[in-house]
Regions:
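Active-site nucleotide/adenylate-binding loops and adjacent lid/helix of ATP-dependent enzymes
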Residues: 6-7, 75-78, 88-184, 223
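Phosphate-binding site of ATP-dependent enzymes
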Residues: 149-236
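C-terminal active-site "lid" helix and adjoining low-complexity regulatory extension at the edge
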Residues: 247-298
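A short glycine-rich, hydrophobically flanked beta-strand micro-motif that places a catalytic Asp/Glu
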Residues: 238-250
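Protein kinase-like catalytic core scaffold
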Residues: 135, 198, 241, 254-257
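Short, surface-exposed coil-to-beta transition loops
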Residues: 68-69, 184-187, 240-241
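Conserved N-proximal alpha/beta basic substrate-recognition cap immediately N-terminal to
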Residues: 9-115
């Protein structure tokens, strides 16, 4: 049995995205195999025995160790993976990506990178004044705000934060002050998938999304947003990801949260701080288009 697209997933809040993915597969005439906790053992057996083959893997269970035997076997068999694990792991290292982005001319906040606490428990002399009165402390790995300290202002906070994830590098970043446009912060969460870019207004305090329209891009001089995201895509080499860009008060488009692979796809119709449904639908369609293109090429 062969499936054009295999989706591994377990998070209940992915359900709306999965329904949209199913619809996109139906529209394209692609077969979809869903691997979930209830059929994981059976799926592993089918994959190892050769009973089932697949064209493309979309892994939404990368942070669940139980799925590792399945996804590792997919790699061993040479099936196409959207966001290959080795590239994803590299791209999600914020310290690495910070250096890559500035090398490629992308604006980022002023940043101090610290070695893991386990490697360097005693900090060197730091000039925190370069970060401004308040700054952000964040681990190099992780998402969803895990381990992030906003509005930090002291060395004591830095020392304490480093011990939470002691084996990870940490970033100290200057806080970016965005412009205000018609009463909204010029802060954007942007989705890149299969060469397409979907920008949204995003409030960093309330986490509320609104799609950024083409008219708004032109009217408010936000057209440089897309080339910045396209350049980030060329650097990180992921098939899909989200990023955060702020349009600063000094007129710069600044990447403030570089590359997120484990994208939260809760829908706005179900969660007030979810992603607009039309954006999720477009993402699903492009992921299926990617699988369809791979099917044609193979």
């Amino acid at each position: 049995m062969h499936y054009d697209l295999c989706l591994t997933w377990y998070w209940e809040y992915d359900a709306d995205f999965v329904h949209m993915l199913e619809a996109a597969c139906t529209d394209r005439g692609l077969s979809l195999w869903q691997v979930r906790p209830h059929n994981l053992v059976e799926a592993v057996n089918s994959l190892f025995s050769g009973e089932i083959t697949l064209g493309t893997l979309l892994n939404r269970a990368a942070d669940n160790p139980a799925f590792s035997p399945f996804t590792h076997r997919v790699q061993e068999l040479g099936f196409f993976c959207i966001n290959p694990p080795e590239i994803s792991h590299w791209a999600e290292d914020k310290a690495t990506m910070h250096l890559e982005l500035i090398t490629h001319g992308i604006e980022t906040p002023y940043t101090i990178i610290l070695a893991p606490f386990t490697e360097q428990p005693l900090l060197p002399v730091l000039d925190l004044g370069l970060l401004g009165e308040q700054f952000v402390i964040k681990p190099a790995y992780g998402g969803g705000g895990e381990g992030v300290v906003m509005h930090a202002s002291s060395l004591e906070q830095v020392m304490k934060a480093r011990t939470e994830f002691a084996d990870r590098k940490y970033l100290l970043q200057a806080q970016i002050q965005p412009q205000e446009i018609t009463g909204r912060k010029a802060w954007f969460r942007v989705y890149y998938v299969n060469g397409k870019i979907y920008p949204c207004w995003w409030d960093p305090q309330t986490h509320i999304f609104n799609p950024l329209s083409a008219d708004e891009e032109e009217r408010f001089d936000l057209t440089p947003l897309r080339p910045v995201v396209a350049k980030i895509a060329s650097v990180c080499r992921l098939d899909w990801f989200s990023t955060e860009i702020a349009f600063s008060k000094d007129g710069k488009f600044v990447a403030v949260d570089y590359v997120n692979d484990g994208i939260d796809l809760r829908s706005q119709s179900k969660a007030h701080d979810g992603v607009p449904d039309e954006v999720i639908r477009a993402i699903a369609a492009e992921l299926v288009a990617l699988a369809a293109r791979h099917r044609q090429a193979s």
